Amino acid sequence: MSKRRIAPLTFLRRLLLRILAALAVFWGGGIALFSVVPVPFSAVMAERQISAWLGGEFGYVAHSDWVSMADISPWMGLAVIAAEDQKFPEHWGFDVPAIEKALAHNERNESRIRGASTLSQQTAKNLFLWDGRSWVRKGLEAGLTLGIETVWSKKRILTVYLNIAEFGDGIFGVEAAAQRYFHKPASRLSVSEAALLAAVLPNPLRYKANAPSGYVRSRQAWIMRQMRQLGGESFMTRNQLN
């Protein structure tokens, strides 16, 4: 009887290990491939596309127009760093002090959860994973972040991030956002336009770059101040990000 009870557990354990091994190979291959090849599609794009189809929106198309860092305004990279991850050039994927502050805040304010994800973590999540806050997903995100930080340069991480970030419903990547909201290529974005796009990133389905609320305008102004404090364009050059 004991053998019959153990056998199914053993089978499930082996199956789980094989699935994890297959995912590790898949994700590892993706990290290696996308270190040099433009990203055609991300997990977030796939999730949005499937949700649209299930909702009967068959005309919905989630895609991004890939552009190199040379074709992105330096203000855009600086804006997302100022808004999301000011220690981006320094850390290895995780901002430990920011994580500790977020945990302390969340313990005191359970109704208003604060995140502390770096640009590297957001890139790993957007590229390979699904939305959610489970410990399983967080664990996978941590592993993928370490992989990306090990294989990719900081400039590559920032390039991929800007090309797959969601800036509105169905608007992925800075080139699509620049064309949609400002009718110009990403290379010509101004300081204020870059800051406005960065201002909607915490929740691009709620905050609108084409109809900014008072909060978004306030956040845009704060981001512009942070960009100046970081040193402007010299920050990007100094850290070899442009």
From Swiss-Prot:
GO cellular component terms, semicolon-separated: peptidoglycan-based cell wall; plasma membrane
Q: What is the lineage of its organism?
A: Bacteria, Pseudomonadati, Pseudomonadota, Gammaproteobacteria, Enterobacterales
Name the record gives this protein: Biosynthetic peptidoglycan transglycosylase
Show the stretches that span the lipid bilayer. 19-39
Keyword hit for Glycosyltransferase: yes
Compartment annotation? Cell inner membrane
Q: What organism does this protein naturally occur in?
A: Salmonella typhi
GO MF annotation: an example: peptidoglycan glycosyltransferase activity
What's this protein's family per the entry? Belongs to the glycosyltransferase 51 family.
Q: In its UniProt record, which GO terms are filed under biological process?
A: cell wall organization; peptidoglycan biosynthetic process; regulation of cell shape
Q: Part of which pathway?
A: Cell wall biogenesis; peptidoglycan biosynthesis
Which EC class, in a word?
A: transferase
Reactions the enzyme catalyzes: [GlcNAc-(1->4)-Mur2Ac(oyl-L-Ala-gamma-D-Glu-L-Lys-D-Ala-D-Ala)](n)-di-trans,octa-cis-undecaprenyl diphosphate + beta-D-GlcNAc-(1->4)-Mur2Ac(oyl-L-Ala-gamma-D-Glu-L-Lys-D-Ala-D-Ala)-di-trans,octa-cis-undecaprenyl diphosphate = [GlcNAc-(1->4)-Mur2Ac(oyl-L-Ala-gamma-D-Glu-L-Lys-D-Ala-D-Ala)](n+1)-di-trans,octa-cis-undecaprenyl diphosphate + di-trans,octa-cis-undecaprenyl diphosphate + H(+)
As for membrane topology, the entry says: Single-pass membrane protein
List UniProt keywords, sorted A-Z. Answer: Cell inner membrane, Cell membrane, Cell shape, Cell wall biogenesis/degradation, Glycosyltransferase, Membrane, Peptidoglycan synthesis, Transferase, Transmembrane, Transmembrane helix
